[in-house]
Swiss-Prot record:
Cofactor annotation remark: Binds 2 [4Fe-4S] clusters per subunit. Binds 1 siroheme per subunit.
Compartment list: Membrane
Domain 4Fe-4S ferredoxin-type: 277-305
Predominant cellular place of this UniProt entry's protein: membrane
Presence of keyword Protein biosynthesis: no
A Gene Ontology molecular function term of the record: sulfite reductase activity
Complexes and interactors: Heterotetramer of two alpha and two beta subunits.
Alphabetical list of InterPro entries matching this protein: 4Fe4S_Fe-S-bd (IPR017896), DsrA (IPR011806), NiRdtase/SiRdtase_haem-b_fer (IPR005117), Nit/Sulf_reduc_fer-like_dom_sf (IPR036136), NO2/SO3_Rdtase_4Fe4S_dom (IPR006067), NO2/SO3_Rdtase_4Fe4S_prot (IPR045169), NO2/SO3_Rdtase_4Fe4S_sf (IPR045854)
GO terms for cellular component: membrane; sulfite reductase complex (NADPH)
Thermal dependence of catalysis: Highly thermostable. Inactive towards methylviologen below 55 degrees Celsius.
The encoding gene: dsrA
Organism of origin: Archaeoglobus fulgidus (strain ATCC 49558 / DSM 4304 / JCM 9628 / NBRC 100126 / VC-16)
Protein name per UniProt: Sulfite reductase, dissimilatory-type subunit alpha
Positions of [4Fe-4S] cluster 2 binding: C267, C286, C289, C292
Amino acid sequence: MSETPLLDELEKGPWPSFVKEIKKTAELMEKAAAEGKDVKMPKGARGLLKQLEISYKDKKTHWKHGGIVSVVGYGGGVIGRYSDLGEQIPEVEHFHTMRINQPSGWFYSTKALRGLCDVWEKWGSGLTNFHGSTGDIIFLGTRSEYLQPCFEDLGNLEIPFDIGGSGSDLRTPSACMGPALCEFACYDTLELCYDLTMTYQDELHRPMWPYKFKIKCAGCPNDCVASKARSDFAIIGTWKDDIKVDQEAVKEYASWMDIENEVVKLCPTGAIKWDGKELTIDNRECVRCMHCINKMPKALKPGDERGATILIGGKAPFVEGAVIGWVAVPFVEVEKPYDEIKEILEAIWDWWDEEGKFRERIGELIWRKGMREFLKVIGREADVRMVKAPRNNPFMFFEKDELKPSAYTEELKKRGMW
C-alpha cells in the first residue's frame, strides 16, 4: 500500500503534478546513492512527501516558525526550515531553502545548469524551482551543516554562482530579456540589472532595513517582468519623442487587418486616427500603453529619445493590500554608470531606513508620510503624471519657505495678530 494515498490523488488528471515531480527526484536521488555517488540527502525528497501527507491528514503545516541560518559573512540568502516531525522523519528535520542569484534575463548555458544541478545533487534534496517570485533560482531542502560547503562549491564552479537576497534587504534585482531578444527594449535591462546587483552587494547580502526592497528592470511598457506589480522600484523603458510610423507598412497591415476596430478604437486615450490612407497619432495624448505597437510592430516603433520611467511602491499584500506602483520619476536617462538612478535609490533607502516602521514597505511609508515629503527626499518637482486621481478636498499645505511675503501679513504681524 502507498505511503502517501492523499498525495497520490494529485497525480491524477491531465495537468502537471508537483507530486509526480517530487517522486521523480526522490527516485533519481535514491538511484544516485545506490550507484555510490556522493549524495548527502538521498531521502530528502521522499521525506518531504511523507511530511506533506501527514500535513494533509492533520490539516496543518509541520514546518516550525523558521530560524536564522546562513553562510559565513552573509545575513541573507537562506530561508530556515525546521520540521516538528524531525524524530519521526529525520530526512526533513532541517530542510532549508537557498536562493541563488540568477543571471540577468535568466539566460543559461546547459553547462551552467549542469554545474548547479551537480552541486545541489551532492549537498541538497535535488529539488529546485526555476524560479522564485523575485527571480532567484530556488534550491529546496538542505541541512544546516551543508549550507557552507554548498555555497563554496557554487562559487568554485567554472561558471560560478552567488547567493541572492532574503529578509529585510535588497532582494535580487531581475530584468526582462531586453535588447537580447526584444525589438521594443528602450534601454539595456541586462546591463543595468547586473550593474545594480554588483554595486549593491552589501545591501543584497546583509539585511539592514525595515523590510524587503525589490528592483525590477523592464525594457518597455509591456513590462514582461510585471515590475509595476511586483517591485518597490520599477524601472520601465519608455521614450520622450513621437512614435515612429512607417505609412507603407501601415497600408500592408490594412490589407488584412481592421485597423479601425483593432487599433484605433482600442487606444485608451483616443490618440490615433486612421482615414484609410494615413495613420496619425497625437503623441501628446499617448500614454505609452504599447497596444498599437504590439498590433503593428512592423509599422510602429518606440521613438528615438529613449530612457525609463521609475515607478515606486508596487507590492503584494502584507501590511496593506496589493499595490500597483505609481510614477515617481516620469523620465530618467539610462546610461552608464547609471548615477541618476543610483542617487535616487540611495536617497530613498536613507529616508526609509530612518522613517520606516518594522515591516513597512517603501510604498506604505509614502502613504503614511505623503508624496510631497517623498519628492523632497529624491529632489523632484511634483508632476501631473504622478497623480493617481484628482484631489477630493479643498485644503492645500505649504512650507514656510514657499510662502511669499505680503503687505497684509506684515500689517498683521505689527499688530500681533499673526
